[in-house]
Amino acid sequence: MQPVPSDPNYGLLRSLFQDPNNQCCAECNSANVPYVCIKLGVFICPTCAHFLSTLGFKVRPIMGSSFSEEDISRLQSIGNLVSKQFWLARWTPMDIVMPPPEDPNLESFLRLKYIEKRWTSSLSTSDGFSSPNNNNTSNVNNINNNSNHNNNINNNNNNINNNNNNNINNNNNIINNFSNINNISNGMNNISLNNINNNNNNNNHYNGNDIGIPIVHKTQSQPQPQPQPQPQPQSQGFSPFNSPRSSPKPGRHHLIDDLISFNPTPVNNSNNNNNNNNNNNNGNNGNPLKFSGGIPQNNNNNNNNNTTTTTTTTNNNNKVPFDPFSPIKTFSESGEYQNTNGNQQLSGSGNSLIDILSHPTQSKSPSPSGTPHSLSPQHHSSDFKVHLIDIPTTQQQLQQQQLQLQQQLQQQLQQQQQQQQQQQQQQQSPISNPFTSNNNSNSEPLVSILDKHEDLHNHHHHQQQQHHKQQQQQQQQQQNGNNSPLAQFNQIQQQQINNNNPFVEEKQPHQHPHHLQHHRHHSTSSINHGSNGDLASISLTLLTPSPSPSPSFNYSGGVSSAPNNSLNNSCNGNNNLNNGMLNFSNLNIGGSTSSACSTNSSSNITIANNINSSNNINIINNQNNQNNNNNNNTNNVMISPSPSPNPFLPTPTSTNQNNHIITPIPVNPFTDNLQLNSNNIRQHPQQMYIQQQQQQQQQQQQQQQQQQQQQQQQQQQQLQMQQQQQQQMQQHYQQQQQQQQQQQQQQQQQQQQQQQQQQQQQQQQQQQQQQQQQQQQHINLSSSAPLQSVNHSPIPLQPQHSSSQYMNQQGYQVYPNVGNQPQSPQQIQPQPLQQQIFQQVQQQQPQIPQQSPQPLQSSTDEDQSVLEVLNLKKLFDMNMMDKEEFEHRRRQIIDNLTKTTSPIHQQPPQPPQPVLPVSAPAQVPQPHPPQQQNGPTVPQQQQQQQQQQQQQQQQQQQQQQQQQPIPQPSSSSPTPDARLTGTERVIRHRFDAKLGKWVQTATIVITEPTPFAEGAMRKAFRMKDLSAEGPSSQMVAKLFKDSNEDRMVYFKDVEMQTYSKEIAERFNLKSPPKKIDFVPAFVMELVERQGKPFCAVEYFIEGKYEKHNNNFGYKNDYDRNTPQAFSHFSYEDSGCQLIVVDIQGVGDVYTDPQIHSADGQGFGKGNLGIEGIKRFFSTHQCNPICHYLGLSSVNPKPANDESGTMPRPPSIGQSYVRPSAFPPNLQQSFSFNFPPLKDHHVLEQLNQQQQHLQQQQQQQQQQQQQQQQQQQQQQQQQQQQQQQQQQQQQQQQQNQQQNQQQNQQQQQQQQQQQQQQQNGHPPPQTPLPPTPQQKDKPKIEVFGDILRKLVS
């Protein structure tokens, strides 16, 4: 990932990004960190960047972004490690478990941190800390304690007095006068030290306050200017870290000034040269101060013999710009300290505190980030090192301090009473928190919050035990009195170190001296420095390591009166100076100490330098002071500096005696340290959280394993169940097969039995037939048979194999022979007249397959045959059929009655041979006695010969067809239609094309119930008009197969055929070679039927029925000229508005046409509009008749093609004159007018013109749509206005419509003029534009007038 290469801060940003501590997200520990949040000063992953952006933080990507110096300083001062340690000090996994990186609950966790401020709710400002106040000072008043004191100080170099307890009297009033301490944090807390007076009078104990000792300061220390804090916007989210603008980075000498920023009363110290050869009792006086992060392992006993006492003054306006999240500067701006004495220069050996502060050396500890020094920033979060300071203090300095304090006691006794009163008032008032703001807010201090989470949690179980041990030790000390107080102090102090320090192993107390002391009840100790000590007046009570990266100073303004103070002040002239480890990242600053036990500091580890003095102080330089050298600090295990190493792990020290720099081991607290195997290391809450997660994962794995085992068991059970089911299914299937086999065997047996029975029955039937045929007599039918009042049509079905001129030859059907009879053309039995007889026939039909056909044995069958013959004779007498058809049908009835014919397979139909009729049976029912008919008879000899031949054929075929199924003849026969049966009265509707209306007349008709032909949509029935005579009485009724068809369809079809007839008449006026005509059609309303149904009726046409074209471009193979020319003529005759197609009929007499209109409206379902017109011309070829009529040439036939009808030569080339007027109703159906067409040579130009017209029409339509939209908008605006405005709009719309109409009329007139000028009319090859033509309705004229106009 590379930012902008041209960025001047590119190198710093690169080193920050390559830091291992910044490689993981500061919020979720994800490995991908392509984003940064400048406000928080951390590197984050894309998921956390998204969540933080939703919470109001500004997030920017590293790739392609530029960073200012302030942004880089922000990232340097904080970084991911500081941020993580800050939150770990406040948050524990026991409170709320941090979600993993991919968990959606991570957003709610971040919301708790930054929006709801769950763990930082006690902070006063949006940054989590109180705002800085540069002028805020707190005065620490003089704390005076009245007591009896002795001024006798014996400076004897030879006396040895180790029993100081006998000479301990009431202590002097030692006043620690602090005034005008201006401690200014770097934007964190305003530190105010309140006046607290703690008096504790114990017998035989030192009772006094901390001794105020003058400190060496810079004489001309200028206050550093503090930048004004900039208010942060509230919408950008909460940040616990301050802006780098208000956080100056102090150097090392500034940090020391912060610790010694007290202004005690100046004391004139005498320059006394004391020879201290062996003055390192319980102290490391020869150790140089180095900011090395630890304490050297061995002590140097060589001390400086000459010490100089200097008097310095401090600036009251001294400021402490300390940023807890900023690293310590490695080099000060001034470069060195100035010596205020002027008489003696500072030591240049580099071993003193001043030399190191004035000439700092670069730390030799390796950078944890591994970044080269040239690329590493000056202040980096990973290079944040907190150094431990060794405080060199000698006995001579102690004596000088005591002398100065005794001189100050006299001056301070006068002010004691006033101070006590002030102290009492302050004790009654609540103690202010030094880390809270001046607004008296209840927010909890930062350092106490940081220490309280971890230290209380880890060391709470030590409190009761330590308190009990301390009480026992105090009681024993009081009982013993003056018996070896130094030994008691050393033992008790060592026990306290071993018990109170959680970082020192309890099993090895001898390795850890008494330099560590834990104060759980706010007991304090004073570090008394010599006159030449640079940190002489610092009273450091608690220097506690904390898991928080923030500092924790604890300035004690008074000494607690707890019993432990006696232990701290019980040494006789011994310095008891331990190397106090000053962890500047964990300094606990306290305004005062109290005698009450406080849990806020019970977990703090106090590392104090206790200097015990009494009124009679014997300072011994030469003798017996070496006895206390056993208390030197050797093999120290130091507390790890924060924040780089883990504060819960010990820091190994270097064994190099020359170089006292202790290199801290960088330990990442967020990762497991597998190399540390110590048993006494205290477990971090994060490690506990990791263990909990591991336990949860193990439990989840166990649960998953259990679930998998359960699933496997379930699957096994399912497999077993499936196998059992399959076995059951197989058994069941086998049983079913066995049952089926048994059933089949039984059926076969039954069939064999039935066949045997049928054979016996057939033999019996043959014998009976022979007997009956011998007894039959011939019945002669005559035309004088009485006519009965029949209500139904007697017309039987025309046989399909007959050669009648009225039947279509394509519907021939052959059936297999029935029973053992010889094969003959199977004839469909005629249907009875009455409905009852028809039902009886249907009931008898299922018995035919079971038994072979038998001759008629009952009187019912004979009656049916007789009635059919009588009805047939009646129709013949009424001239409804000719003699040939009559004879054919009569023979059919006789053949069906006698069963003497058989069908012939796969042979074309042959004309029937003249067969004499067979006499009807003699038995005739009484109600209808049969009448004999005059006609020829058949001799009995011929009849016997035929019977013998039939018997022989039956015997030959009987064996082959015994098991063949017998078909039902009635199943293939058309069923009669109940709508057309018998004779009835009807109303005939005839359309008059001249008048354009329907005319109704009443008549009587007789129809047959069964159709003689069927089409795709309709059935054809025979009908006769009894009111007419001759051929006009023969008609055909056409009914739709769908009884729910709309009635108006019949009227539309008749109307369309009437229009075609009118166009055919105009076609005949052109004198074509053959004239054409359309059969007149009517609509019959059957008023006597239920529901009064309608049917289309037209005159019957005799001859061969042919179809020349259809409504979708079909053309007959013969391609006659006249029908095709008529369709072409109808298109141009109608002004290119319609075309007549679907020409079919007999000869040139056509019927059932179809009309395509340009608008696609009207003329029934077959009207295909423009598409139908295009289909016709796609297959049409202009023939000579088209040229004769003067029609436009479209795909003309070759000139040498002389097939078809040819017109007369003189008439070729004549132009067709369109009639001036059309029938009124026909004119109404023409809703579009097509533009004139030119010759076929300019068809391409026409196509272009048509396309141009189409584009114009589209533009017009678009304009109209736009106008409509504008009108709609206007209407919406106008609806809100008054009614008057609405009326005006309506008038405007009317005017627009009138203008449009006028424009359309003008266009139509122009088009008509162009049509008259042009002669050619070729049909279009592309879709014609639908330009409507509105014509005025002409007056109704007589057909004769129209003919006159046409002729003229």
From Swiss-Prot:
One of its GO terms (molecular function) is GTPase activator activity. Residues 393-429, 689-781, 1241-1320 form a coiled coil. The gene is ak1. Transmembrane segments: none annotated. This is Alpha-protein kinase 1. It is an enzyme of class 2 (transferase). Residues 1334-1352 have a biased composition (Basic and acidic residues). InterPro entries: a-kinase_dom, Alpha-type_PK, ARFGAP/RecO, ArfGAP_dom, ArfGAP_dom_sf, Kinase-like_dom_sf. Belongs to the protein kinase superfamily. Alpha-type protein kinase family. ALPK subfamily. One of its GO terms (biological process) is protein phosphorylation. Residues 7-127 form the Arf-GAP domain. Residues 237-246, 329-352, 359-379, 799-812 have a biased composition (Polar residues). It comes from Dictyostelium discoideum.
